Curated annotation (Swiss-Prot):
Cell compartment(s), UniProt: Cytoplasm
GO molecular function: ATP binding; CCA tRNA nucleotidyltransferase activity; tRNA binding; tRNA-uracil-4 sulfurtransferase activity
Protein name (Swiss-Prot/TrEMBL): tRNA sulfurtransferase
Record's catalysed reaction(s): [ThiI sulfur-carrier protein]-S-sulfanyl-L-cysteine + a uridine in tRNA + 2 reduced [2Fe-2S]-[ferredoxin] + ATP + H(+) = [ThiI sulfur-carrier protein]-L-cysteine + a 4-thiouridine in tRNA + 2 oxidized [2Fe-2S]-[ferredoxin] + AMP + diphosphate; [ThiS sulfur-carrier protein]-C-terminal Gly-Gly-AMP + S-sulfanyl-L-cysteinyl-[cysteine desulfurase] + AH2 = [ThiS sulfur-carrier protein]-C-terminal-Gly-aminoethanethioate + L-cysteinyl-[cysteine desulfurase] + A + AMP + 2 H(+)
SMART domains in the cross-refs: THUMP
HAMAP family: ThiI
Listed PANTHER family: TRNA SULFURTRANSFERASE (PTHR43209:SF1)
Keyword tRNA-binding: yes
Broad class of where this protein is predominantly found: cytoplasm
Reported function: Catalyzes the ATP-dependent transfer of a sulfur to tRNA to produce 4-thiouridine in position 8 of tRNAs, which functions as a near-UV photosensor. Also catalyzes the transfer of sulfur to the sulfur carrier protein ThiS, forming ThiS-thiocarboxylate. This is a step in the synthesis of thiazole, in the thiamine biosynthesis pathway. The sulfur is donated as persulfide by IscS.
Amino acid sequence: MKLIVKTFQEITIKSRPVRKRFIRQLAKNIRAVLRDLDPELKVEGEWDNLEVETAVVDAKVRREMIERLTCTPGIGHFLEVHEYPLGDFDDILAKCKAHFGDQLAGKTFAVRCKRAGKHAFTSMEVERYVGSGLRRECGAAGIDLKQPEVEVRMEIRLDRLFVIHRQHPGLGGYPLGALEQVLVLMSGGFDSTVAAYQMMRRGMISHFVFFNLGGRAHELGVMEVAHYLWEKYGRSQRVLFISVPFEEVVGEILTKVDDSYMGVTLKRMMLRAASRVAERLELDALVTGEAISQVSSQTLPNLSVIDRVTDTLVLRPLIVSHKQDIIDTARQIGTAEFARHMPEYCGVISVNPTTQAKPYRVEHEESKFDMAVLERALERATQRTVDRVIDELGQDLQVEEVGEVLPGQIVIDIRHPDAQEDEPLALEGVEVQALPFYAINSRFKELDANRQYLLYCDKGVMSRLHAHHLLNEGHTNVRVYRPA
């Protein structure tokens, strides 16, 4: 299979040195993204497009390659093509007929040709010759250049002919690694996950910092969605996940700060801590999922007061987005279900929050706060690479594993719905229920408490994590299913 990758349009207007640097970075990223699927993958080209060639013939692996490329920043679109040496017009006609002849009977069509290089003919001459030949030989209803039912597309590059089989959309943006790096304040909800996606799509390596306000389930959920975002949109780069224990900080605010200023104070403490993390990691900006007046702390006066605690640039990609648009985007990128089942703690911190915070007043409230508490939180922060975050968490957990399902036991497939669809878990004589990992904690209580449940995932890591959490919650009827 050969693919021709067309770069994001804004890359093409850059200066020659910048353009070449971006293309080289994109080629490097494509190799990194597809390396595990084909170690012999070839990526060539350095100007306005890249040619990707693989010898893989397995249809499932090819589909996975295409899916990964559609989620790789820097790509405008890419083409599946069949490559041939460039022959005469009759040879071009024969190649197009071989690929499109069966589709043309009784239908209108158009021929589109693009060329690069010097030739003794024009693109229009190719289109006319091939179009008339296909109409004559394939029983087409006619030629329609405006709204054809079938498009016969090709590209001619020097002495090579590419007949285009299919076009796939790209993510756009710049290649990850070509721009600066940022730190995303991640709560795991709709807003922060979409904000992270927007930054990654634009081409910025996005690291994650999570402020744990007092819930192991919340931390696990945020780790899972951060891992998902990295795996789907940022896997070409090394990304960090930093978790900062903020329970003491919340306790200090609840006991020392006036109710109306609790929310603003909490956000200021988060920005202070995030700025310290960003400074240590030499990151260029902070990213939040805030939108104007979506909640009380996000009014302009409050945001202004919040930002005063840091000199680090704070980016808010969703600042004028409507909530429904954010939810729709989350659904499109695959984070909506994570967000829907994510525990939320921030909203309970203040009963009557101010929408017009005054700098002098918030400074007065913060004077009561023991900053040593914030320092301790930063000292206790943990840092992992996001690709290993789930595996490392599950390594030392002691959970009973079984290799055989006993009569009456139910196997719960907690894999992502995409994995469940691609490879359904079928066990003869065994009841299997699909309940994705991001929903298992919130929905397990709905299941029959008198039955025994075995959690299943491919590697056993995610199932061990969630079984351990459910056991800690008091559910004694859960184990891990690890078939031999």
